[in-house]
Swiss-Prot record:
<keyword id="KW-0677">Repeat</keyword>
<feature type="region of interest" description="Disordered">
    <location>
        <begin position="61"/>
        <end position="107"/>
    </location>
</feature>
<feature type="compositionally biased region" description="Polar residues">
    <location>
        <begin position="87"/>
        <end position="107"/>
    </location>
</feature>
<dbReference type="InterPro" id="IPR011992">
    <property type="entry name" value="EF-hand-dom_pair"/>
</dbReference>
<protein>
    <recommendedName>
        <fullName>EF-hand calcium-binding domain-containing protein 8</fullName>
    </recommendedName>
</protein>
<dbReference type="InterPro" id="IPR051242">
    <property type="entry name" value="WD-EF-hand_domain"/>
</dbReference>
<feature type="domain" description="EF-hand 1">
    <location>
        <begin position="111"/>
        <end position="145"/>
    </location>
</feature>
<dbReference type="InterPro" id="IPR002048">
    <property type="entry name" value="EF_hand_dom"/>
</dbReference>
<dbReference type="GO" id="GO:0005509">
    <property type="term" value="F:calcium ion binding"/>
</dbReference>
<feature type="domain" description="EF-hand 2">
    <location>
        <begin position="146"/>
        <end position="181"/>
    </location>
</feature>
Length: 203
């Protein structure tokens, strides 16, 4: 058993063994009180831990290149996001819908109405009325590229009151409505050009 220094029970001086993590206490009469664990290992751990604990926040906050994730760049509303939106979402022309009908109306607007009126009145009856069969036959002779289904659709659009026949005045009124509608659409598209490219708000 290694030698140890003894101290009185009063606790003025703590006795501990340098070679063993235990110390033996005796009272003033010399009676052995037993062997107790030495606080030396605990004190040494505290001395080693406190300096490391002081540096711990700095070690945790330090960033090493290559290990820490790179911060993501926030997309600016007026920057690259607009360019990506303009590339991924093409601006479509509203008049692209029903392109065949628009092409047909453009051909009608370019035609000489005087010549068409002569053919129209020749096929109409004494009241100036022209039924669907005669209307389709006239339009086939004028616009041979149009299908019969499209000509039937045109007849229904001209016959707005659904009487089953059309007159030259009805046809002129239809042409005026189409022209005014196209003019309003053209003006609205012209005004929209000042607001492009539109800003897309992300969800």
């Amino acid at each position: 058993m290694p030698s140890s220094l003894h101290a009185p029970l009063s606790g003025e001086v703590s006795a501990f063994s340098l070679s063993c993590p235990y110390f033996r206490c005796q009272d003033s009469t010399g009676e052995d009180l037993g062997r107790f664990p030495s606080p030396l290992p605990f004190l040494m751990c505290l001395l080693l831990f406190f300096p490391f604990r002081a540096r711990w926040p700095r070690l945790m906050s330090s960033e090493k290149p290559g290990e820490s994730p790179k911060p993501q760049k926030m997309a600016q509303p007026g920057g690259s996001q607009k360019k990506e939106t303009s590339r991924s979402v093409p601006v479509t022309d509203p008049t692209s819908h029903n392109s065949e009908i628009n092409q047909r109306d453009q051909q009608f607007s370019d035609m000489h109405l005087a010549d068409l009126q002569k053919v129209f009145e020749k096929e109409a009856d004494e009241n100036g009325a022209l039924k669907k069969e005669g209307f389709i036959r006239i339009m086939k002779g004028v616009l041979s590229s149009m299908s019969e289904e499209m000509l039937e659709l045109l007849f229904l659009k001209v016959d707005s009151d659904c009487n089953g026949f059309v007159t030259w005045q009805k046809y002129v009124d239809y042409m005026m409505r189409e022209f005014q509608g196209k003019e309003e659409m053209r003006k609205s598209q012209y005004r929209l050009r000042f607001h492009l490219p539109m800003t897309v708000i992300p969800l």
